[in-house]
Amino acid sequence: MLQTDNLTAAQPQRIVAAQTASAQEELLERALRPKTLDDYIGQDKAKEQLAIFIQAAKKRGEALDHVLLFGPPGLGKTTLAHIIAKELGVNLRQTSGPVLERAGDLAALLTNLDPHDVLFIDEIHRLSPVVEEILYPALEDYRLDIMIGEGPAARSVKIDLPPFTLIGATTRAGMLTNPLRDRFGIVSRLEFYENRDLTTIVSRSAQLLQLDMSEEGAEEIAKRSRGTPRIANRLLRRVRDFADVKNNGTIDGGIADAALSMLDVDAQGLDVMDRKFLEAVLHKFGGGPVGLDNVAAAIGESTDTIEDVIEPYLIQQGFLQRTPRGRMATERAYLHFGLPVEK
């Protein structure tokens, strides 16, 4: 039986959260994951560049240059890493920045790589400084420099490594140190998806899950998925549950709308937490500007939750502005709630 991961937040995971909520969800994601660049939907610019770089590396018989994938969570960075390894015809070893606590943890991974293999480090911005220092010569010269022993008896040992490709993924490229960032020869930013591509992704997932779904049903799910495939696939599974009970398993536009409305996800992809925040700015503070601490106190959320979880999507979609004087609701926010626009 699969166990749900412990979440750091005290509140339940939002259905529109871009992070993976549980081990079971991660397992389902893997089942829906495309296996080749041709199957990968969206991110056309990144795909085109990677296809050329991969073909060139294979033609020369070399390891692919180190790759940095960055962008918001849930856009397919892990999927792309697996696809790159498959397209290269090599093995992939996967880990994450917080797991690599000591230099020996990284050394154990690197010394077990075969020539041209891919090492994928998720959340690479969370590498400890000591591990990052060990990584530099490995990336530049395919060599490990490690210290054995302590005090006067300590000595440096150099270990040659096979040529390999590091793929780093991060949601916070700005937190990478300059020396680490400069060692990536290929840098790709993943963007939020257009509704058109999300509709295709939802339709593909429905086929893999053997669901009876109309084009309108796929479009309804896509437009509420906040530009994020992970959210789209999660909403699809919840709509499937609703359709199984209410409509003999058939998902059309009306069923998708009813299911998502029941889940409090509106037509713009906003959930209860988003609306609670915007309504506080609009009704309690006259649309702003208002300081972050005041809004946090008004809605009973921490400032960290507001900055990291609530605000990014609202700003990206044009519902909110951050100004030197505080947060301000935009014209789009007024219109969304049917309020007269403040002049």
UniProtKB/Swiss-Prot annotation:
Q: Write out the domain note.
A: Has 3 domains, the large (RuvB-L) and small ATPase (RuvB-S) domains and the C-terminal head (RuvB-H) domain. The head domain binds DNA, while the ATPase domains jointly bind ATP, ADP or are empty depending on the state of the subunit in the translocation cycle. During a single DNA translocation step the structure of each domain remains the same, but their relative positions change.
Q: Where located? A: Cytoplasm
Q: Which SMART domains match?
A: AAA
Q: Which UniProt keywords apply?
A: ATP-binding, Cytoplasm, DNA damage, DNA recombination, DNA repair, DNA-binding, Hydrolase, Nucleotide-binding
* Region annotation Large ATPase domain (RuvB-L): where it falls in the sequence: 4-193
Similarity field: Belongs to the RuvB family.
Return the annotated region ranges for Head domain (RuvB-H): 267-343
The residues that the entry says bind DNA are: R322, R327
Family annotation (InterPro entries): AAA+_ATPase (IPR003593), AAA_lid_4 (IPR041445), DNA_helicase_Holl-junc_RuvB (IPR004605), P-loop_NTPase (IPR027417), RuvB-like_N (IPR008824), RuvB_C (IPR008823), WH-like_DNA-bd_sf (IPR036388), WH_DNA-bd_sf (IPR036390)
Lineage of producing organism: Bacteria, Pseudomonadati, Pseudomonadota, Betaproteobacteria, Neisseriales
> What's the protein called, per UniProt?
Holliday junction branch migration complex subunit RuvB
GO CC annotations on file: cytoplasm; Holliday junction resolvase complex
Q: What is the annotated role of this protein in its UniProt record?
A: The RuvA-RuvB-RuvC complex processes Holliday junction (HJ) DNA during genetic recombination and DNA repair, while the RuvA-RuvB complex plays an important role in the rescue of blocked DNA replication forks via replication fork reversal (RFR). RuvA specifically binds to HJ cruciform DNA, conferring on it an open structure. The RuvB hexamer acts as an ATP-dependent pump, pulling dsDNA into and through the RuvAB complex. RuvB forms 2 homohexamers on either side of HJ DNA bound by 1 or 2 RuvA tetramers; 4 subunits per hexamer contact DNA at a time.
- Residues engaged in binding Mg(2+): T78
CDD domains named in the record: AAA
According to its UniProt entry, the protein's GO biological process terms are: DNA recombination; DNA repair
How does this chain assemble?
Homohexamer. Forms an RuvA(8)-RuvB(12)-Holliday junction (HJ) complex. HJ DNA is sandwiched between 2 RuvA tetramers; dsDNA enters through RuvA and exits via RuvB. An RuvB hexamer assembles on each DNA strand where it exits the tetramer. Each RuvB hexamer is contacted by two RuvA subunits (via domain III) on 2 adjacent RuvB subunits; this complex drives branch migration. In the full resolvosome a probable DNA-RuvA(4)-RuvB(12)-RuvC(2) complex forms which resolves the HJ.
Q: Which residues bind ATP?
A: L32, R33, G74, K77, T78, T79, E140, D141, Y142, R183, Y193, R230
Q: What's one Pfam family here?
A: RuvB_N
| Reaction catalyzed | ATP + H2O = ADP + phosphate + H(+)
Small ATPAse domain (RuvB-S) as annotated region, ranges: 194-264
Which segments of the protein form a coiled coil according to its record? none
Q: What is its EC number?
A: 3.6.4.-
Please list the GO terms describing molecular function: ATP binding; ATP hydrolysis activity; four-way junction DNA binding; four-way junction helicase activity
